UniProtKB/Swiss-Prot annotation:
Organism expressing this protein natively: Pinctada fucata (Akoya pearl oyster)
Miscellaneous field: Two hypotheses for calcium binding are proposed. Either the Gly-Xaa-Asn repeat domain bind calcium or sulfite and sialic acid provide the necessary negative charge in the N-glycan to promote calcium uptake.
Name by which UniProt lists this protein: Nacrein
Cofactor: Zn(2+)
Sequence segments annotated as region (Disordered): 218-329
GO CC, one annotated term: cytoplasm
Length: 447
């Protein structure tokens, strides 16, 4: 994004928090690379628009971003760098953390997406499109939607930037909000420990994305993609009627989900995807594949352990992480899946473009498509940084506990986007920064 230079001066006489300069994902892009091809030719620059890459052979990789430019020094010596591994049982419950909402609610936005070379393509709202994040008491109401982008990894299973208890998902979506430059920061009533003074320029909502095959329909053809990208979707509401059920993919007590007697992620579903009880059903005895939970915090064997995070014995209780009240249900994001499939496959996004030669693809989307249903928006929050240079430490992270599922085709299409001049795609190096080792306090909105 664009932002005010937040001075974070270290022992060296160097202020390394730059938020007012321009960079991908977080800054409005002017110049992304010194030569437009994605190559950093000179190291130890002072420019904040110096190029960076996930490929160490043409530009220092994530572990050495701080050596590219003095402006990037926070990437190496910062105290609140992101992403992090979130340890769920160490996170502190804060009773007054607000619900995550948006204003206006379920607003469909006109966005433009382009090829961003070795970065994740991002969906940026067109001028005049306004959407604000609502986190009453935690931040003021002036954080405006800046973009949606999705990170992937070098492997299909490890693509998220954050992890929970050491576990990753294939992708992670980021909804980036930036404080409106036209307004002053208003004091908030809920403080996160007060370890870091000043204000956060950004609120970034992180969503763990899983992938699946069932229930997403056939791959859309080019003609169908034209309608999808303009915001026209079939009438099958994501929270309405499901594939084979009376009450939809996410129906609380739907009679028939994808393969079971009750909804795909039904709170009391008898049959989830392949198990005796819902995939993440609040009272489901079994996770992904029968007796074995998906990611049991205290499960005997993790992915295939006896007790999944939302299985019989979650982190602290018999039902879900802390019992029925705060269990999860994986939303199957059908509309978002088809939008991402069509966008990533389109030549304007898929093919490598030099700076100045980008072609924007118009896409209509609702950012809330990427989020769990409102009643399942339990989250972890902490004060961190941008995950790309300059790694500015001015971000309030809101990382969703509950996952969202998209089609496997989305992952395939994203990994096949060309990120380099020679045609190398994003599958080779990924677009994720490794988790950082610094100690930050993480809070959570659920017990």
């Amino acid at each position: 994004m664009y932002l005010h230079l937040t001075a974070l001066c270290v022992v060296i006489p160097l202020c390394y928090g730059a938020s007012m300069f321009k960079h991908d994902h977080y800054m409005d892009n002017g110049v992304r690379y010194p030569n437009g091809d994605g190559i950093c030719k000179q190291l130890n620059e002072t420019k904040c628009d110096a190029g960076f890459s996930y490929d160490r052979s043409i530009c220092e990789g994530p572990h050495y971003w701080h050596t590219i430019s003095k402006c990037f020094i926070a990437c190496g010596i910062g105290q609140r760098q992101s992403p992090i591994n979130i340890v769920s049982y160490d996170a502190k419950f804060r009773q007054r953390l607000p619900k995550l909402k948006f204003k206006p609610h379920m607003e469909k936005l006109k966005t433009e997406v382009t090829n961003h070379q070795n970065r994740a393509p991002e969906f940026e709202p067109e001028d005049g499109e306004n959407l604000y994040v609502k986190l009453n008491n935690l931040v003021d109401g002036h954080y405006k939607f800046h973009n949606l982008h999705v990170h992937n990894g070098r492997t299909r299973r490890k693509g998220s930037e954050h992890s929970v208890n050491g576990r990753f998902t294939p992708m992670e979506a980021h909804l980036v909000f930036h404080h409106d430059d036209q307004t002053h920061f208003e004091p908030t009533r809920t403080k996160l420990g007060g370890a870091f003074p000043g204000h956060n320029d950004f609120v970034v909502v992180g969503v763990f994305l899983e992938v699946g095959d069932d229930g997403f329909g056939d791959e859309p053809d080019d003609e169908e993609c034209k309608h999808i990208l303009k915001g026209h979707h079939p009438d099958n509401n994501e929270n309405g009627n499901g594939d084979n059920g009376n009450n939809g993919y996410n129906g609380d007590n739907g009679n028939n989900g994808d393969n079971g007697n009750n909804s795909y992620n039904g709170d009391n579903g008898n049959n989830g995807v392949n198990g005796n009880n819902g995939y993440n059903g609040d009272n489901g005895n079994n996770g992904d594949n029968g007796n074995n939970g998906y990611n049991g915090d205290n499960g005997n064997n993790g992915d295939n352990g006896n007790n999944g995070e939302n299985g019989n014995n979650g982190e602290n209780g018999n039902n879900g992480e802390n019992g029925h009240k705060h269990g999860c249900r994986v939303k199957k994001a059908k509309h978002l899946s088809r939008i991402l499939e069509c966008a990533y496959r389109n030549d304007k996004v898929r093919e490598f473009k030099k700076v100045g030669e980008e072609e924007g693809l118009d896409v209509h989307l609702t950012p809330e498509m990427a989020l769990p249903p409102l009643k399942y928006r339990h989250y972890y929050t902490y004060e961190g940084s941008l995950t790309t240079p300059p790694c500015t430490e001015s971000v309030l992270w809101v990382v969703q506990k509950c996952h969202v599922q998209v089609s496997r085709r989305v992952l395939h299409a994203l990994r096949n986007v060309e990120g380099y001049k020679d045609g190398t795609t994003l599958r080779k190096y990924g677009t994720r920064r490794p988790t950082q080792k610094n100690k930050v306090t993480v809070y959570k909105s659920f017990k």
